C-alpha cells in the first residue's frame, strides 16, 4: 500500500484517541507518517516533504483552518504529483467534515482518510494565491467566527459562534461593496456575505445550502437587511424565501469595496478592497464517504 502522511495540529499532539487510531493503522501493516504543526507554514513544509516520502495521501488533522492550510499547500505542487487529501476532523466546528458526512469519531475518520474512495473536488481560489475548500464569509459572519472567544468555543462547540453572534448584534456594521459575476450584478450594503463551495459555516449553519464541491460552481448568498435581524438570520439559515436574502450560483465573482472588507476563508482572515474569486474544477482528490451530500 502507498504511504500516508498525517499533518496534525499541535493542539492535538497529546490526544490519546489520535495516538491509538494511528497505532491501529500501523498495526495493519500500513505506513503512516506523522508530522506536528506548531506555527503557520509548517503544513506547507510537510506537504513538500511528502513528495520525498512517496506519500499518496496527506491527511489534515485539525479543524477547518488546518484543512485549508493543507489544501492550499497541496495546490503548490504540480497536479500530477499532488497527493490525495484526507481529513481527520479535530476542530471546534468541523464545518467541512460535517458537511461531507466524514465521521467525527477519530478511529473511523482516520480509517476513511487512509482507505476511503478518492473523489475529485473543486477548490475556490482568491486573488490568484489564496484558497478555500469550504466557504468564504464576509461581514457579520466573519466577525462572529474570528472574534468568538476560544473558551466559549471549547465549552460549547459550534453553537458558540451563533451565541456569540447574538451577543454582538448591537455592533452590526454592513459592508458596502459591488459584486459582479456571469449574469449577476449587485451593489449595496451587505450584513452577511457567504460564498460557498461547501454548504455550512459558523458551526453548522447552512449558509449556502445548494452548494456542491464537484460542480464547478459556488453559491453566493447575501443578507442585506438590518431590520428584524433575528428573523432574517433565521430565514438565512432555514431556507425560507426572503427579499433581503439574495442568491446566485456562479463560477467566478469580482468584489470591490470603497473600504477594507475582511473575508474568512475557512477560518483564515483576508482583508482588502478587491477580491477575484473563482472555482478551480476538480483541483484535488479527496477521500470521502460514499454518502457525501456535497457531491453532485
From Swiss-Prot:
Family: Belongs to the diacylglycerol/lipid kinase family. YegS lipid kinase subfamily.
Alphabetized GO MF terms: ATP binding; lipid kinase activity; magnesium ion binding
EC top class, as a word: transferase
Annotated catalytic residues: 268 (proton acceptor)
EC number, as in UniProt: 2.7.1.-
Keywords for this protein: ATP-binding, Cytoplasm, Kinase, Lipid biosynthesis, Lipid metabolism, Magnesium, Metal-binding, Nucleotide-binding, Phospholipid biosynthesis, Phospholipid metabolism, Transferase
InterPro entries: ATP-NAD_kinase_N, Diacylglycerol/lipid_kinase, Diacylglycerol_kinase_cat_dom, Lip_kinase_YegS, Lipid_Phosphate_FormReg, NAD/diacylglycerol_kinase_sf, YegS/DAGK_C
Membrane-spanning residues: none
Example of a GO cellular component annotation carried by this entry: plasma membrane
Keyword NAD attached: no
Source organism (scientific name): Yersinia pseudotuberculosis serotype I (strain IP32953)
Cofactors that this protein relies on: Mg(2+); Ca(2+)
Domain DAGKc: 1-130
UniProt-annotated binding residues for Mg(2+): 212, 215, 217
A GO biological-process term: phospholipid biosynthetic process
Protein name: Probable lipid kinase YegS-like
Stated role: Probably phosphorylates lipids; the in vivo substrate is unknown.
Pfam families: DAGK_cat, YegS_C
Location(s), subcellular: Cytoplasm
Cofactor note: Binds 1 Mg(2+) ion per subunit. Ca(2+) may be able to substitute.
Positions annotated to bind ATP: 37, 63-69, 92
